[in-house]
Design a protein with these regions (language model features):
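Long, contiguous internal "core" modules enriched in hydrophobic/ aromatic residues
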Residues: 1-212
């Protein structure tokens, strides 16, 4: 049976770092970083970069070096998130415009409006999930609540705001090819490429957001 690791408080973790052969140049600074960002996020996530083939830390490795890599990675994630959000906003705007223009702002969540080559059951399941999300947000999201109470439906340009990037990607995939092409044309790429980009963006965004 694998022995469960015992809890160590920040001071104990600081000493544990030293026993691993990692150089600590400033006890107070290192302790604050452990408290603020967690030992696991800093050491466990990046330790392999600084270890040799014997699974021991390379000679001369300092905590500051490991933390610098953690900081670099964190800042890189923030950059990715910033530009993914920009692209997401653009796609949402164009997508809602295409759907509204071609299918109206009321009856767009109908199976016949989507790709006929996709199984109707799968499309209906996706539409049901979108409708469930609308119902869930009713009473919580101001715009959703307003449109349901006043008009009895939610237009695409409002719905699009509550969809995650993953849900947005699925909605785009369900569109008829001619509609996907109208969206992708705005980015000067094919609908096939945009579909793949959206899937990749969803994966990268989730990794960055959850610090995996």
């Amino acid at each position: 049976m694998v022995k469960v690791k015992e809890y160590k408080n920040p001071n104990e973790l600081l000493e544990h770092i030293k026993t691993k052969g990692i150089i600590v140049l400033d006890n107070n600074s290192t302790l604050e970083k452990i408290k603020k960002y967690s030992y696991y996020s800093i050491i466990n996530s990046y330790k392999d970069v600084f270890k040799n083939s014997d699974n021991e830390y390379n000679e001369g490795v300092s905590f500051d070096e490991i933390f610098a890599l953690y900081e670099f990675d964190k800042n890189l994630r923030l950059i990715f998130l910033k530009y993914i959000l920009e692209i997401e906003i653009n796609i949402k705007s164009i997508l809602s415009e295409v759907i509204s223009a071609n299918y109206g702002i009321k009856d767009y969540l109908i199976v016949k409006n989507y790709d006929e080559t996709i199984d109707e059951t799968l499309i209906q399941e996706s539409i049901d999930k979108i409708q469930d999300e609308i119902n869930k947000q009713n009473g919580k999201h101001t715009a959703i609540t307003h449109y349901i109470n006043k008009y009895g439906f939610v237009p695409p340009y409002v719905l699009i705001k509550i969809l995650t990037l993953g849900e947005l990607s699925k909605l785009f995939t369900m569109l008829k090819q001619i509609d996907r092409q109208l969206v992708s044309k705005e980015f000067k790429i094919s609908d096939k490429l945009l579909k793949q980009i959206m899937k990749n963006m969803t994966l990268v965004r989730n990794i960055c957001a959850h610090n995996d």
